[in-house]
Curated annotation (Swiss-Prot):
Protein name listed in UniProt: Phosphoheptose isomerase
Coiled coil: none
Family affiliation: Belongs to the SIS family. GmhA subfamily.
Residue ranges of domain SIS in the record: 37-191
Length: 191
């Protein structure tokens, strides 16, 4: 009954991934992001990750696989998702939702750390402010975006953009693949 719908959804997902794969710049940016994070870890730095909605879940997943493990046992890496409910609700209430990530970056981020921000539109105000706060602290910045990169286009040190203009879930599907590859490359860099 739904077999055509299922095939169409999987075909569209594959098409989005194949379009992303066809641009060598995307592959180079993934490698650059992994090397940037590994270099920070080698200098006792950390990565702070943030996003909204499904991207927030991806930011937490990224941090969890850094501190826990990806595929193989290895020492944990300093990955922190900006996801503490008391922090998020306090800052949202007292300063506004646009500041939930930047306030954390200002408090916890240090020169040499990395901010890893996810926004499928590239227009999330709170991620933009987090990138600005990270740069002010001397941190490196990585943005996972979609569509045309939105306001984040060209703002981060490394931007990895999924150029899909349909629903955000297709962008998120590629983002999670990128996250897993970045972790795999970090592990190789840290050997």
């Amino acid at each position: 009954m739904y077999q055509d719908l299922i095939r169409n959804e999987l075909t569209e997902a594959a098409d989005v991934l194949n379009k992303f794969l066809s641009d060598d710049h995307n592959i180079a940016q993934i490698e650059a992001a992994a090397k940037m994070i590994a270099e920070s870890f080698k200098q006792d730095g950390k990565v702070l990750s943030c996003g909204n909605g499904g991207s927030h879940c991806d930011a937490m997943h990224f941090a969890e696989e850094l501190t826990g493990r990806y595929r193989e046992n290895r020492p944990g890496y300093a990955g922190i998702a900006i996801s503490d409910p008391s922090h998020l609700s306090c800052v949202s209430n007292d300063f506004g939702y646009d500041y939930v990530f930047s306030r954390y970056v200002e408090a916890v981020g240090r020169k040499g750390d990395v901010l890893f921000g996810l926004s499928t539109s590239g227009n999330s105000g709170n991620i933009l402010k987090a990138i600005e706060a990270a740069k002010a602290k001397g941190m490196k910045t990585i943005a996972l975006t979609g569509k045309d990169g939105g306001k984040m286009a060209g703002l981060a040190d490394v931007e990895i953009r999924v150029p899909h203009f349909g629903y955000a879930d297709r962008i998120q599907e590629v983002h999670i693949k990128i996250i897993h590859i970045i972790i795999q490359l970090i592990e190789k860099e840290m050997e």
